[in-house]
Design a protein with these regions (language model features):
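Contiguous, small/hydrophobic- and glycine-enriched helical/loop subdomains that border
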Residues: 470-488
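Short pre-catalytic strand/loop immediately N-terminal to key active-site residues, enriched for Gly-Thr
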Residues: 448-452, 631-633
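Left-handed beta-helix
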Residues: 1-278
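Catalytic-loop motifs flanking and including active-site residues across diverse enzymes
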Residues: 12, 403-410, 456, 460-464, ...
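Glycine/charged-rich beta-loop-alpha catalytic/anionic-binding loops adjacent to active sites
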Residues: 389-396, 438-450
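C-terminal nucleotide
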Residues: 175-179, 183-434, 483-493, 501-635
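DPxDG-like acidic metal-binding loop motif
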Residues: 452-474
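Short, conserved phosphate/pyrophosphate- and ester-handling motifs at nucleotide-, phospho-/glycolipid
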Residues: 9, 457, 637
Length: 637
C-alpha cells in the first residue's frame, strides 16, 4: 500500500519531510555521512552563511540567501529571499517568504510557524501573537486594513522594489516595532494579501533565482560528496544542468573513494560533457574517455576477487579421453535487467527464469580433448571455423565482439593459460603446454543463433568454463562457474548480468535473488514445473524464432549508463521489475496459469519501457496477429 504525507501547514511541511527522510534507516543504503546537528534541518537551493548549531531544529530554507549576520533559532521557514546584507534575527516560530511580483518588485510576507491564516483580524493570530496586539504595537488601525474580515485576504504585505527597503520593513514587521523607517516604508508601499500574492507571483523570476542558487550549490555539494547526497541524486538531471550552464566539473575523486562512487562519478562526468551545448569535438572525446573509465572501473570491481585467485591448470584426463560439456539455454519471464550491474550491485536483483532444452537435447555443447602438439586448436561446428593458437599474444586477443572464438580464448585465459591468471610463470604458451602435458583442442557447438535472447553467449561461456574446469582439474562448482562467466563477459567488454548463466547452469524453473554488493551469488528458490509440463498446459507454451537478432552489447551500454546516473525513471522501473518477479514467483507457486500468463505480458510491457528498441516494427507486426489468442508473450532476454 501507499503512504500519504500532508504538506498543508508549516508544521506538516517539516514533519512530512522528516518522515520521508527517515523511511530508510539502514546506514548501508545511505552512502553519505550527514553532518546536520539535527535531523529536522532542510536546506535546498540556498546560499547559507551562518553555521547550524545544536539549538537549531525544525528549519526549512529554500531558494534563499541567508547572510552572515542572520540568526536563525527554531521553527523557522525562509523562502525566496534574494541576495542581501541584512542583520536579521528570526525568533522561534518566525518565518519569511519573499515573492517576486512583476518585473522588478517583491512582496514581503513574514508569518508565524503556527499561523492558520483564517479569521477576522480582531480575532486571529499573526506571527504567533494576536494580530490586534501586533497592529496596536505598530500604530496600525485595523479598520483601515482592506480585507480585514480574513487574514488570508487582508492587504498587509508590502511591495518593495529594492532589498534595502525589504530588510528594513522586515525588521519592523518581525520585531523592531519602533523602527520608524520600517513603518514609513510599509505605509507608503502598495500592499497585497496572501491570496493576491499567490495570484500575482512572477514564477519565472522565482525559478530563475532558484536555478542560479542551485548552480552555486552543485559544485559545493559535489566537493562535499562524502557528507552530501550528490552521488545518490539523479545524476542524469545534474549532468544536464552542468552541461546546459557550462558548470566546471568537480575535482577528481580520491582513490580512497569506493569503487561504485568512482564509477558513478566517471559516468556523471561523461554525461556532463555530452550535454555541453558548446563543447564540440573536445567535449565529445572527453565524454567517451570518461564513459570508458566508468566501464573499466565496473570491470575492475567485478573481476578483482576472481583474478586475485590465480589458477594452476593440471591435466586431469587420459590421452584418449574427451570432456563433453552440455547446457540448456534459458528464458526469463520476470525481473530480467535487475541482474545487471551496477543496479544489482546497489540494490540486488530478482529474476524468474527457466532452463530449456530444444528437441529434448541441450543446444549448447563443448568438447575438450588433448592433442599431441603444444598448441591450442579452436573449432566451431556450427560456424565451420577453426583457429590455431601458438602464443600468449594470440590467446589474449579475446576482447573483440563478433570474433568466433572470443569466448573460448577468454575461458582458457581464466583457466590459467595466460600469465596474469596463472600461479606459475612460463616464458611462452608452448612451454606451458609442454609442462601441462599436451596441447588442447576445444570444439564448440551452438544449435541456437547468437542474438536470440536465450542467453546463448553467456551459457556457451559457462559450458566452456565447466568443461575446462574438469579437463584442467580446477574444481569449480556451478556457483564459481557462474561468477567466472560474469568475469569473462567483463573481459570481453560485453557486460551483462548473472541471470543468463545461472538460468542454464541450474535446472528447471526458479527465482534467483541477490543482495547488494560485488559478490553476486544468487540464492535459488525452485518452483514446480506443473504449469509447463502437465498435459493440460504443455501445449499452451510456444517458443517462436522470429529470425530477428540483436547484439546485447549496445543495448546494455545505454541501459547501464542510465543505471550509473541514477536516472529516476529507470531506477523506478527496475524496482518495479524486482517486485514483479516476486509476483511471478507467487503465481507459479500457486499454479495459477492465467495469472502467470498475464504477468508475462506485463514483463513485456516493462521491458519496452526500459528499452524502446525491444519491440521493433517487424516483431510488433507478428504479435498483433496473436493478441487475442494469448494471455501474454515476450521476447526473451
Amino acid at each position: 500500500g501507499g503512504e500519504f504525507y500532508h504538506f498543508g501547514t508549516s508544521h506538516e511541511l517539516l514533519s512530512s519531510m522528516l518522515s520521508i527522510q527517515n523511511i530508510v534507516n539502514d546506514q548501508r543504503e545511505i552512502m553519505h555521512h550527514d553532518r546536520k546537528p539535527h535531523p529536522s534541518i532542510f536546506v535546498q537551493n540556498t546560499e547559507l552563511k551562518p553555521k547550524w548549531t545544536q539549538q537549531n531544529r525544525n528549519e526549512w530554507v529554500e531558494n534563499a540567501y541567508v547572510g552572515e549576520n542572520w540568526t536563525l533559532t527554531q521553527d523557522n521557514i525562509v523562502t525566496g529571499v534574494p541576495e542581501n546584507d541584512w542583520t536579521l534575527t528570526l525568533s522561534e516560530g518566525q518565518c519569511v517568504d519573499i515573492v517576486p511580483i512583476g518585473a522588478e518588485s517583491w512582496a514581503v510576507r513574514p508569518y508565524g510557524f503556527n499561523d492558520k491564516f483564517r479569521g477576522d483580524l480582531a480575532d486571529v493570530e499573526y506571527l504567533g501573537r494576536p494580530f490586534a496586539e501586533w497592529a496596536a504595537e505598530r500604530g496600525i488601525d485595523l479598520n483601515a486594513i482592506e480585507g480585514r474580515h480574513d487574514l488570508q485576504a487582508a492587504r498587509i504585505f508590502p511591495i518593495v522594489d529594492n532589498t534595502d527597503d525589504m530588510g528594513i520593513v522586515l525588521r519592523w514587521m518581525l520585531g523592531e516595532s519602533t523602527l520608524a523607517e520600517g513603518k514609513a516604508i510599509w505605509e507608503k508601499a502598495k500592499r497585497m494579501s496572501a491570496d493576491e500574492i499567490s495570484a500575482e507571483a512572477n514564477l519565472r523570476r522565482l525559478v530563475d533565482q532558484r536555478t542560479k542558487l542551485r548552480l552555486k550549490n552543485l559544485p559545493m555539494i559535489a566537493k562535499n560528496w562524502q557528507h552530501s547526497v550528490f552521488y545518490q541524486s539523479d545524476l542524469q538531471t545534474v549532468a544536464r544542468e552542468y552541461g546546459k550552464y557550462d558548470v566546471a566539473l568537480p575535482n577528481a575523486l580520491p582513490e580512497s573513494a569506493s569503487l561504485l562512487t568512482r564509477t558513478c562519478d566517471a559516468m556523471f562526468r561523461s554525461e556532463a560533457e555530452r550535454q555541453r551545448t558548446n563543447g564540440g569535438t573536445q567535449s565529445s572525446e572527453q565524454a567517451k574517455k570518461y564513459e570508458a573509465a566508468a566501464f573499466s572501473l565496473l570491470r575492475e570491481g567485478l573481476t578483482t576477487e576472481a583474478l586475485r585467485v590465480k589458477q594452476r591448470p593440471q591435466l586431469s584426463v587420459y590421452a584418449d579421453q574427451i570432456v563433453w560439456g552440455r547446457s540448456p539455454v534459458r528464458i526469463d519471464i520476470a525481473g530480467g535487467w535487475t541482474d545487471t550491474p551496477p543496479f544489482c550491485l546497489m540494490e540486488g536483483g530478482n529474476v524468474v527464469n527457466l532452463a530449456i532444452n530444444l528437441n529434448g537435447q541441450p543446444p549448447l555443447q563443448t568438447y575438450v580433448k588433448p592433442c599431441a602438439e603444444p598448441h591450442i586448436i579452436l573449432r566451431s561446428i556450427d560456424l565451420g571455423a577453426s583457429e590455431v593458437i601458438t602464443t600468449y599474444e594470440e590467446l589474449s586477443a579475446y576482447n573483440t565482439v563478433g570474433s568466433p572464438f572470443s569466448i573460448p580464448k577468454a575461458a582458457l585465459s581464466l583457466a590459467g593459460f595466460l600469465p596474469r591468471f596463472c600461479k606459475d610463470s612460463y616464458r611462452s604458451l608452448e612451454e606451458q603446454l609442454r609442462a601441462f602435458g599436451c596441447g588442447i583442442e576445444v570444439t564448440l557447438l551452438s544449435a541456437i543463433p547468437a542474438g536470440s535472447g536465450l542467453g546463448t553467449s553467456s551459457l556457451l561461456a559457462s559450458t566452456v568454463l565447466g568443461a575446462l574446469s574438469d579437463f584442467c582439474g580446477l574444481g569449480w562448482d556451478k556457483t564459481e562457474i557462474g561468477h567466472r562467466t560474469l568475469v569473462l563477459e567483463q573481459l570481453l567488454t560485453t557486460g551483462g548480468g548473472w541471470q543468463d548463466q545461472y538460468g542454464g547452469l541450474l535446472p528447471g524453473i526458479k527465482l534467483l535473488q541477490t543482495e547488494r554488493g560485488f559478490s553476486q551469488s544468487p540464492d535459488v528458490r525452485y518452483l514446480p514445473g506443473d504449469l509447463f509440463q502437465q498435459p493440460a498446459y504443455r501445449e499452451c507454451h510456444l517458443l517462436y524464432y522470429t529470425g530477428i537478432t540483436r547484439t546485447a552489447k549496445t543495448i546494455l551500454a545505454e541501459i547501464v549508463r542510465r543505471m550509473f546516473l541514477n536516472e529516476h525513471d529507470e531506477l523506478l522501473q527496475l524496482r518495479e521489475m524486482k517486485a514483479h518477479a516476486l509476483e511471478m514467483f507467487d503465481a507459479i507457486q500457486r499454479l495459477d496459469f492465467e495469472r502467470m500468463g498475464r504477468l508475462v505480458g506485463k514483463t513485456w510491457q516493462q521491458n519496452q519501457l526500459l528499452d524502446a528498441g525491444t519491440n521493433p516494427p517487424a516483431v510488433e507486426a507478428l504479435t498483433k496477429q496473436i493478441d487475442d489468442l494469448c494471455l501474454g508473450y515476450k521476447l526473451p532476454g
